[in-house]
Amino acid sequence: MGKSPKEVLAEFQANMSKLQSAIPEVTADFTKRLMPDALKDGVLSTKVKELVALGIAVCATCDYCIAIHVNKCFEAGATKEEIAEALGVAILMGGGPALTYSTFAMQAIEDFAPEA
């Protein structure tokens, strides 16, 4: 069995910190400007934008991205049911690979869901 979503997220955060130290001039634009600006509330809420980002992450077959955006979906107020529906759209658009990566997203939902 592979790494859990929490392990994947922790690994990403540790390695991103190293990358930011090594090439801050490259990473700063993405992490400090582009990402916050793209995901802030606008006509679409941050929650909707995170659900879209999750669907793209699933279609891109990116474990790191899936772990990050499932966690961010919950932080933005999404429910398990809303996240599952977003996965359904990802499967529609991404086919078999998206279906496969949606199983990792389902584990991430269990790992990152707020305590009831």
Kindly give the residue locations of the regions a language model identified.
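Residues at alpha-helix boundaries and short interhelical turns
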Residues: 20, 42, 56-63, 77
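Alpha-helix C-capping/helix-to-loop hinge sites
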Residues: 37-41, 55, 90-93
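Amphipathic alpha-helical hairpins
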Residues: 41-51, 65-82
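Short, thiol/selenol-centered motifs that function as redox-active sites or metal-ligating centers
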Residues: 52, 56-68, 93
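Charge-rich, acidic-biased intrinsically disordered regions
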Residues: 77-88, 113-116
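C-terminal structural segments of small proteins and small subunits
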Residues: 84-108
